[in-house]
Amino acid sequence: MSKVYDWFEERLEIQAIADDITSKYVPPHVNIFHCLGGITLTCFLVQVATGFAMTFYYRPTVTEAFASVQYIMTEANFGWLIRSVHRWSASMMVLMMILHVFRVYLTGGFKKPRELTWVTGVVLAVLTASFGVTGYSLPRDQIGYWAVKIVTGVPDAIPVIGSPLVELLRGSASVGQSTLTRFYSLHTFVLPLLTAVFMLMHFPMIRKQGISGPL
């Protein structure tokens, strides 16, 4: 085993990378509230894992979506647990994200030289809210249907471009199969990909600039 490690160490300098990660200076004023971003990340990883598991059973069609969710909850092995964890972790992710934004704002973490860190964080917050909106529609129940109908109907009040925006969001004039397909694609592919990209920008900037000072 040591020979295998030595082979990788010679080529990749794994130990130097590990030392750099573990030896980062942590300011003395850091407290539990500085962990809110990390908790949000943990919730996101839980969402990815449980969401991926449910894709094996979920069917994104208006005729089968609700029945497939029922199957997950009542017949699939540990399906009720996986969906429950996904649901509660989603709520926790939103809550931790909101608290994290407040903590950063109140401690001045958005000020120079951390403006770009703040901007990427705001984008991640918007993406998190978008996860909630798109995911809410997937069970295709009454609550999800009317929530999506109301949310996608909001742009209709905008002059000139309102109606085209509504049709763009729904895929048609009304909430139907096109809407479910679009929201499923957004929820399972587009939003996770964008979130991963902005996280890969957000974290290195935190690593480079460090944590903002105390109040």
Swiss-Prot record:
Q: Does the keyword Flavoprotein apply?
A: no
Per its UniProt record, what Pfam families does this chain match?
A: Cytochrome_B
What NCBIfam families does the database record attribute to this sequence? PRK03735.1
The reply on keyword Cell inner membrane is no
A GO BP annotation: respiratory electron transport chain
Summarize the protein's role. Component of the cytochrome b6-f complex, which mediates electron transfer between photosystem II (PSII) and photosystem I (PSI), cyclic electron flow around PSI, and state transitions.
Gene assigned in the entry: petB
Q: Quote a single Gene Ontology cellular component term.
A: chloroplast thylakoid membrane
An annotated Gene Ontology molecular function: oxidoreductase activity
Cofactor(s), names only, from the UniProt record: heme b; heme c
Q: How does it assemble?
A: The 4 large subunits of the cytochrome b6-f complex are cytochrome b6, subunit IV (17 kDa polypeptide, PetD), cytochrome f and the Rieske protein, while the 4 small subunits are PetG, PetL, PetM and PetN. The complex functions as a dimer.
Q: What else is known?
A: Heme 1 (or BH or b566) is high-potential and absorbs at about 566 nm, and heme 2 (or BL or b562) is low-potential and absorbs at about 562 nm.
Q: Which organism is it from?
A: Drimys granadensis
Swiss-Prot/TrEMBL keywords? Chloroplast, Electron transport, Heme, Iron, Membrane, Metal-binding, Photosynthesis, Plastid, Thylakoid, Transmembrane, Transmembrane helix, Transport
Residues annotated as coiled-coil are none
What is the topology of this protein in the membrane according to its UniProt annotation? Multi-pass membrane protein
Question: Cofactor binding mode, per the note?
Answer: Binds 2 heme b groups non-covalently with two histidine residues as axial ligands. Binds one heme group covalently by a single cysteine link with no axial amino acid ligand. This heme was named heme ci.
Q: Which residues cross the membrane?
A: 32-52, 90-110, 116-136, 186-206
Residues annotated as binding heme b 1 are 100, 202
For the ligand (heme c), the binding residues are 35
Localisation per UniProt entry: Plastid, Chloroplast thylakoid membrane
Q: Determine the domain of life of the protein's source.
A: Eukaryota
Q: Which family does it belong to?
A: Belongs to the cytochrome b family. PetB subfamily.
What HAMAP family does the annotation carry?
A: Cytb6_f_cytb6
**Name this protein carries in UniProt:** Cytochrome b6
Q: Give the SUPFAM superfamilies listed for this entry.
A: Transmembrane di-heme cytochromes (SSF81342)
Q: Where does heme b 2 bind?
A: 86, 187
